[in-house]
């Protein structure tokens, strides 16, 4: 019994999704895609670890589709592609989520809840949405090993991190320093520069700013002649002014002394500021006013410049403490030099608070300026603001320090105030801020020259969304700057998609690299494996659990630990199985309880910090295989490293992409990945960021359920390049489902219907190309060209181009051209060689398309492929994803034939567009197309497909005109956007010359693609791309131009043409009735048509033609037709009765 190609009653891609998933699971297709490639070359892919403490979104479908495409493609190209899933389980996102769910803050940890209990909650919470992630991954068809993922909280994973840190330590790249760092009071930890540079961290905020007046102690004589002398310094953070200890001027900046008045108090003042910023603070109109004539409240405040200075002239001048709450000691309150001072804004004088700015701390230290620090109850030096973001309260400070250094009457009003409202749980943005309070106090005290709101760019914490502070922290750093040049050098070898991200965003980041702040003052994360003595005289960096085990043994012997907790739990060093490592926990608080012993017998405690969670993910190439404790040979022999390809969102450019690159460079002097796609954001259809709060987020689960995964994936990939932002619109998914998948499904259905009627199973040998009709040779040539181009696109990480090429082929060449032109070959009776060629050709196209589209649309590609080979048996694999990618056959490519057919398609498209312009249907014959040919090659191409064009556009003849002169009048119009920059002042003359171009000159421009003018002895060359060539319509004709091709269509409809058009229209209407009546394609019919003076002549003349086309045995005209179907034409109607014989 012959096999039949599957035929479907409806097209449901959601059902296809489920059916194919079931098939994959039952046949273990994903596993086979790797096992069947055992021994083949490896294509190495790294999966960036998401965090499972949040639900996956529609943007994750985009990111995972991109990864999946190239892994599937490379598998089909014969590579073994192993891909291991991973979970990012540590860090702020997890901790903040747990704090919120438990209703606690960081300060409660260790008090109301133990660290062990807290971390247990974190361990559980971080995997909360694992099932949802696995479900989405499964449903969208992303093949990645979810059964054996790497998990960053795993002890073996952490051990590899420790080993990597030890390598950095041994190279001198790990150090401890007390520096100003970005700090998040809301999260309670310092941040690295790459965290601070995540997208959206820098935001425009409107803050209260002040130009402060710093009263001089020892003014120059000319400065003391009018009122009180002051230095002016501007700040966007008035809360830092109580910590001011210096003013900074630029070494090459010009300054002026200006006599004027304080606009708030009306008091006379002499102020010093940068000359370049004079007009920013004084109205130039007031320069003409006399100082003596000023009255308090006048809108224009007079001013007079009395002296000029260079920055160094002001150095060493002293001033009074602006806000004398705390005495910082000797050496403060003087003017110093700083190269970073500019005149872009402010006053050209920078207020220095060494405890709250990296540049401030640096210049202050160089000039011997002390920072303003408090002493707490423990005797520790601290900045005026505590780690929660508030001024220290008096009861938190050392009593002796308060007596000696603190002005209690002034300080107590502000003690305990948060420096930002965002840090105070009891305040909103609408409440008065500390900045405003300080500015109002300064205004009253004649210390404020100008107070105003100012919009500036300010960093925010990437996880809490609250402002950061620049804060002095005792932190561990990776000296990444020491390897900066090598990172830049290696980056140039990476294939970035797009290239601009590698040279721009990422490259510029590397050029301005800072040392990596590794420390995190948190609880759930990888502990820093460094133990130190209390006096910091000795330290140990531990690289493995075995080393820690042995060091504990020494500590036990020294009496610092009673027993070895790892030995007590039965842990065996050197046994790397999961069961052994599950006996221990390398997290806090357990690792904190371990005391080691130094070389000279002192106890050593672990440094309390955790490490940056981005180090966890950046170490995944090594930690996922427990390198170097296991699988050392695999990595060292480059079987699993570096990655051939990775992909993540653009937000990872300074995140995962950087940490991968940094660790690989510093530890292995290697790249971590050879190619990377940095995909853009998925926005809503209006270009806004999606969020649940705004109600514009798209649920991926319901979208897949409604449309299936393939249309979603195809839409996302083909709508725009992966690295461009996607304006997501569900209407686009439906359009893809209908236009591409619907067209492909209909093409297959057409094939299956007739192949089943004829019993075609592709058992015959392939017909030689020279025995196939020209149309078959053409489509197979185009198909092979497609194979080559799509293969190149996939190989060059250009999935959008690949998808669009496939879509264009299916829609334009296969369905709309090949199948439509060849329907009759499939309808005809008998199984001729011509029909066999048609079947083999169409089958080959469908099977090849299934393979080409498989990486992007894995479900329907597999269904289509299985439906085809299930009958023919031409491949012995269970899935298209186990098949080989199509190979380009150059012998089947005929570029001349492709050019001819492209000409037919182009002419047809242009003529059909002209028909639509005057609303003349294609079934209405027209008399003539006139084509002025540019050259003999163009004419030959059209001649070769002349009959086809005439048939497609329904015209009686094609006339060629040698040259357009005398028949069609062409004109040229300049594209000034292109030509303007090219010709500049000559543009007017060029435009005049273009307007006067002769028909012969225009013909030359069309033929050669360029034309040279003589403009008074100077040559001017224009190209065809720089202008628009158009033709004027002539009476009774419509004209269209496209590149070198011009067509004119005669649109006059004669009576003879009208009769033929009616006959063709009747055929179409009757065929529709056959279809709606459910007739079989072989059923014969009898026709009765009502008489009508508009149609009778046409019916009589074309009676035989109509019958032949609709399988009619007779066509009779009657005065009245009972039980007929009404046929409505533009200006009349008639009835037809169709009866099956």
UniProtKB/Swiss-Prot annotation:
Binding positions (ATP): 692
Main location: cytoplasm
Motif 'KMSKS' region mapped to chain: 689-693
UniProt motif 'HIGH' region: location: 50-60
EC number: 6.1.1.5
Keywords associated with the record: Aminoacyl-tRNA synthetase, ATP-binding, Cytoplasm, Ligase, Metal-binding, Nucleotide-binding, Protein biosynthesis, Zinc
Annotated Gene3D superfamilies: 3.30.720.200, HUPs (3.40.50.620), Isoleucyl-tRNA Synthetase, Domain 1 (1.10.730.10)
Function: Catalyzes the attachment of isoleucine to tRNA(Ile). As IleRS can inadvertently accommodate and process structurally similar amino acids such as valine, to avoid such errors it has two additional distinct tRNA(Ile)-dependent editing activities. One activity is designated as 'pretransfer' editing and involves the hydrolysis of activated Val-AMP. The other activity is designated 'posttransfer' editing and involves deacylation of mischarged Val-tRNA(Ile).
Protein name: Isoleucine--tRNA ligase
Highest classification ranks of the organism: Bacteria, Pseudomonadati, Bacteroidota, Bacteroidia, Bacteroidales
Protein encoded by which gene: ileS
């Amino acid at each position: 019994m012959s096999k039949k190609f599957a035929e479907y009653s409806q097209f449901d891609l959601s059902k296809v999704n489920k059916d194919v998933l079931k098939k994959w699971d039952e046949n273990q297709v994903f596993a086979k895609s790797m096992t069947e490639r055992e021994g083949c070359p490896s294509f190495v892919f790294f999966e960036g670890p998401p965090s499972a403490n949040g639900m996956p979104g529609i943007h994750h479908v985009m990111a995972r589709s991109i990864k999946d495409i190239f892994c599937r493609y490379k598998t089909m190209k014969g590579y073994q592609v192993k891909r291991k899933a991973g979970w990012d389980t540590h860090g702020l996102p997890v901790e903040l989520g747990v704090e919120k769910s438990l209703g606690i803050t960081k300060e409660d940890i260790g008090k109301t809840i133990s660290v062990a209990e807290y971390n247990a909650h974190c361990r559980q919470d971080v995997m909360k949405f694992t099932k949802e992630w696995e479900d989405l991954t499964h449903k969208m068809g992303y093949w990645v090993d979810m059964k054996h993922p790497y998990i960053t909280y795993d002890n073996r994973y952490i051990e590899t991190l420790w080993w990597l840190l030890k390598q950095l330590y041994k190279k001198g790249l790990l150090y401890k320093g007390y520096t100003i760092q970005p700090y998040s009071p809301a999260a309670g930890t310092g941040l690295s520069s790459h965290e601070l540079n995540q997208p959206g961290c820098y935001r425009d905020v409107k803050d209260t700013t002040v130009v402060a007046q710093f009263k001089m102690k020892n003014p120059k004589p000319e400065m003391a002649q009018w009122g009180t002398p002051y230095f002016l310094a501007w700040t966007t953070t008035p809360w830092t002014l109580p910590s001011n200890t210096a003013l900074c001027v630029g070494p090459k900046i010009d300054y002026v002394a200006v006599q004027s008045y304080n606009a708030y108090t009306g008091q006379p003042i002499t102020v010093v500021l940068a000359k370049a910023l004079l007009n920013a603070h004084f109205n130039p109109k007031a320069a003409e006013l006399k100082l003596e004539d000023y009255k308090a409240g006048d809108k224009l405040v007079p001013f007079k410049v009395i002296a000029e200075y260079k920055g160094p002239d002001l150095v060493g001048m002293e001033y009074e403490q602006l806000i004398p709450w705390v005495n910082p000691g000797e050496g403060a309150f003087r003017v110093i030099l700083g190269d970073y001072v500019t005149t872009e804004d402010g006053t050209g004088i920078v207020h220095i608070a060494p405890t709250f700015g990296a540049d401030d701390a640096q210049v202050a230290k160089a000039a011997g300026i002390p920072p303003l620090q408090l002493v707490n109850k423990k005797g520790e030096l601290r900045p005026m603001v505590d780690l929660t973001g508030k001024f220290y309260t008096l009861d938190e400070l050392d009593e002796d320090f308060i007596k000696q250094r603190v002005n209690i009457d002034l300080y107590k009003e502000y003690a305990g105030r948060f420096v930002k409202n965002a840090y105070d749980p009891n305040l909103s943005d609408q409440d008065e801020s500390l900045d405003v309070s300080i500015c109002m106090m300064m205004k009253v005290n004649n210390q404020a020259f100008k107070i105003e709101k100012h919009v500036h760019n300010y960093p925010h914490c990437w996880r809490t969304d609250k402002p950061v502070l620049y804060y002095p922290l005792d932190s561990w750093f990776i000296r990444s700057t020491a390897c900066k040049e090598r990172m830049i050098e290696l980056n140039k070898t990476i294939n970035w998609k797009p290239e601009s991200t590698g040279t721009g965003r990422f490259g510029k980041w590397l050029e301005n690299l800072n040392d990596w702040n590794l420390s995190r003052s948190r609880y759930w994360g990888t502990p820093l494996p460094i133990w130190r003595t209390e006096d910091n005289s000795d330290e140990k960096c531990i690289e493995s659990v075995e080393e820690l085990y042995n060091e504990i043994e020494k500590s036990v012997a020294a009496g610092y630990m009673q027993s070895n907790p790892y030995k007590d739990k039965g842990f065996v060093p050197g046994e790397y199985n999961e069961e052994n490592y599950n006996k221990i926990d390398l997290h806090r608080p357990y690792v904190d309880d371990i005391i080691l012993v130094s070389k000279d017998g002192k106890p050593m405690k672990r440094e309390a910090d955790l490490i940056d969670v981005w180090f966890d993910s950046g170490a995944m190439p090594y930690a996922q295989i427990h390198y170097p404790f296991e699988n050392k040979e695999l990595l060292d022999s480059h079987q699993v490293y570096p990655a051939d390809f990775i992909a993540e969102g653009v937000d990872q450019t300074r995140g995962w992409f950087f940490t991968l690159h940094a660790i690989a460079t510093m530890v292995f002097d290697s790249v971590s990945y050879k190619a990377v796609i940095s995909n853009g954001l998925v926005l809503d259809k209006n270009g806004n960021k999606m969020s649940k709060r705004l109600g514009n987020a798209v649920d991926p689960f319901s979208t897949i359920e409604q449309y299936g995964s393939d249309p979603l994936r195809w839409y996302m990939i083909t709508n725009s390049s992966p690295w461009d932002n996607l304006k997501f619109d569900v209407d686009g998914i439906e359009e893809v489902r209908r236009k591409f998948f619907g067209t492909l499904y209909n093409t297959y259905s057409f094939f299956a219907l007739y192949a089943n009627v004829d019993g075609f199973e592709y058992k015959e040998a392939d017909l030689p190309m020279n025995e196939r009709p020209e149309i078959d040779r053409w489509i197979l040539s185009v198909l092979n060209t497609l194979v080559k181009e799509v293969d190149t696109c996939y190989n060059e990480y250009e999935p959008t181009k690949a998808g669009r090429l496939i879509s264009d082929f299916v829609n334009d060449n296969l369905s709309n051209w090949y199948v439509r032109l060849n329907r009759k070959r499939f309808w005809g009776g008998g199984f001729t060689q011509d029909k066999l060629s048609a079947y083999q050709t169409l089958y080959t196209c469908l099977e090849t398309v299934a393979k080409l589209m498989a990486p992007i649309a894995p479900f329907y590609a597999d269904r289509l492929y299985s439906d085809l080979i299930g009958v023919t048996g031409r491949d012995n694999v269970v899935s298209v994803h186990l098949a080989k990618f199509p190979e380009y056959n150059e012998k089947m490519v005929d570029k001349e034939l492709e050019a001819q057919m492209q000409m037919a398609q182009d002419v047809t498209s242009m003529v059909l567009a002209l028909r639509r312009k005057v609303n003349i249907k294609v079934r209405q014959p027209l008399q003539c197309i006139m084509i002025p040919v540019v050259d003999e090659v163009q004419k030959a191409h059209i001649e070769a497909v002349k009959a086809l064009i005439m048939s497609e556009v329904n015209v009686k003849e094609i006339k060629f005109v040698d040259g357009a002169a005398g028949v069609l009048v062409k004109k040229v119009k300049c594209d000034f956007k292109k030509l303007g920059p090219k010709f500049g002042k000559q543009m007017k003359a060029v435009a005049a010359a273009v307007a006067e171009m002769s028909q012969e000159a225009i013909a030359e421009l069309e033929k050669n693609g360029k034309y040279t003018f003589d403009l008074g002895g100077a040559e001017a060359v224009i190209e065809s791309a720089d202008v628009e060539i158009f033709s004027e319509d002539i009476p009774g004709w419509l004209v269209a131009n496209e590149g070198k091709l011009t067509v004119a269509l005669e649109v006059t409809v004669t009576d003879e043409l009208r009769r033929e058009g009616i006959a063709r229209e009747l055929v179409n209407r009757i065929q529709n009735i056959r279809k709606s009546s459910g007739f079989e394609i072989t059923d014969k019919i009898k026709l009765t048509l009502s008489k009508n003076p508009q149609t009778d002549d046409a019916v009589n003349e074309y009676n035989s033609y109509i019958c032949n086309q609709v399988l009619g045995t007779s066509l009779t005209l009657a005065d009245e037709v009972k039980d007929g179907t009404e046929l409505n034409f533009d200006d009349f109607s008639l009835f037809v009765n169709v009866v099956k014989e």
